[in-house]
Amino acid sequence: MNLINFSYLNLLFGAGLFSVLESATILNTESDAKKWLTTYNDEAGKYIYDATEAEWNYNTNLTDHNLGISIKKSNDLATFTEQKAIEANKKFVWKNFTDPLLKREFSKITDIGTASLSDEDFQKMSGLNSDLTKIYSTAKVCNKPNDPSGKCYPLDPDLSDIISKSNDLEELTWAWKGWRDASGKHMPDKYDEFVQLLNKAANINGYEDNGDYWRSWYESPTFRKDCEDLWQEIKPFYEQLHAYVRRKLQKKYPQIAFPKEGHIPAHLLGNMWAQSWENIEYLLRPAPDLPSMDITEELVKQNYTALKLFQLSDTFFKSLGLIQMPQPFWEKSMIEKPADRDVVCHASAWDFYNRKDFRIKQCTVVDMHWFMTTHHEMGHIEYYLHYKDQPISFRSGANPGFHEAIADIASLSVATPEYMQSVSLLPNFTDDPNGDLNFLMNQALTKVAFLPFGYLIDQWRWDVFSGDTPRPKYNSKWWHNRCKYQGVYPPVIRSEQDFDAGSKFHVPNNTPYIRYFVAHIIQFQFHEALCKAANNSRPLHRCNIANSKEAGKKLAELMKSGSSIPWPKVLENLTGSEKMSAKSLMAYYKPLIDWPEKRKPRAENWMGGKMSSWIV
């Protein structure tokens, strides 16, 4: 679930529209500006390619040598970026241009992010970012209970496998606590220094703090309120789902004294961060006598490999009439974890900005999770492929959430029983209302369970950036948010010696996270519009757009524009509305929302519940 494939370009380039560099001193025509942009795009593409290639080499082989090259190339890019922004402001009164597209391109070129820092500060910031990412990517947990081998376990696949499959409470607690001790606990001082530098760059560029800068990418003064309104719209559904899951877990683990406030122990939900709950679907199936929707067993039975998962994903996108993966993709992607070196395993999609080199990096395991992840990452590549002919400044999603939503479009179709059966991966599905409920529950455990987590991470970071959450309160505020929004609590006592936010990749890697919350809302708007284009006659949750060239045409039109058009207009072109809305999501899940068992009232109110006993 990660479009931002490397840290330095994420640091360098935002999507904001604010320029703070020198006022123009020489008046040139818009014709001159277009000629200047031609040269700029050629030069920028080369610098970005070099920085991206160096960062790829480091991510796929975590050595000090590769890190040194990567920092050097990112510094070169930062210098180029700053120089060109200054030049653009000196040569052109671009804010007075009459061509809105030309003005938009210049506004992006002159909004340079952390490239505005001094060379010394930029190098310090780059080094801190690399240090934080390396701590995360090389962390291992040792001393597993009842394991005399002395083996140390990395997150992927080992600790993730334990959290997702084990029923042993001692083992689950060991993995949960051990991961946080090995990763986040080593980060807070470095992270605090990193935050100060990010804020310094934001201030130079005219923003109140780095959170203000990140929010500017959505080009809306009401963005924060809009997100809160969306959360309030879907919160009752999440509360119902949470209460149902809690009741089931209480039955499974009677030896645990669940807190009276109504929270769930975070290590019992089948995911290291409790961000999705599909791994405990077997406990939660509305019709438990029917077969599981999990296709892992079938994938293994049919001898699927990582490569075969990628080929199947490529076939799905080709069936829509979209662009197939180019040959360099197959030659250069890292689709399995190497045995001979440390790498950043977190799945990511990469655009090398030369219109021909696009790659995925992930440590694939043959199971349903990676089946879905592969389609997600390839969705990012499709977006790259479709906007590759845009100018450099427009080679991004209409807003950051669009990229993640497009990446998830495939998942809403390939998860359907119809698609699974069409590729012979779900031979025993029962097509009746109970089977439907099982399917929707599985989808909700993946997508609805994620929503508060997708919302809370940047709520926490924005408060860190603004100073509302100072260093001595990092961990207590983190658990305040997790308690308030997710309704989970830690299985062991936490303190300010811990830094549990750092146990999630996107925090040390400095990848903004609110995009995933936005994406998990608007992907259902996209899906509904594409299903209409495909003349779908089934309920929205059973719509499968595979093989629909009309749906593919609509999707391609959206992707081709990149960020050249303000996102509300792009949304309106596809859906008929320029507003983000949860109505399509609620329509998708209506049979599950109306299911009587899930609608049992809950006795507790954990939203905002006390958590003082969990933090010392």
UniProtKB/Swiss-Prot annotation:
Q: Which residues bind chloride 2?
A: Y218, R515
Q: In which tissues is it expressed?
A: Epithelial cells of the midgut.
Keywords (alphabetical) are: Carboxypeptidase, Disulfide bond, Glycoprotein, Hydrolase, Metal-binding, Metalloprotease, Protease, Secreted, Signal, Zinc
Bound cofactor: record note:
Binds 1 zinc ion per subunit. Chloride.
Cited InterPro entries: Peptidase_M2
Give binding positions for chloride 1: R180, W478, R482
Q: Which Cys-Cys disulfides exist here?
A: C142-C152, C345-C363, C531-C543
Q: Which PANTHER family match?
A: ANGIOTENSIN-CONVERTING ENZYME (PTHR10514:SF27)
Q: What family does this chain come from, according to its entry?
A: Belongs to the peptidase M2 family.
Specify the protein name.
Angiotensin-converting enzyme
Q: Which organism is it from?
A: Theromyzon tessulatum (Duck leech)
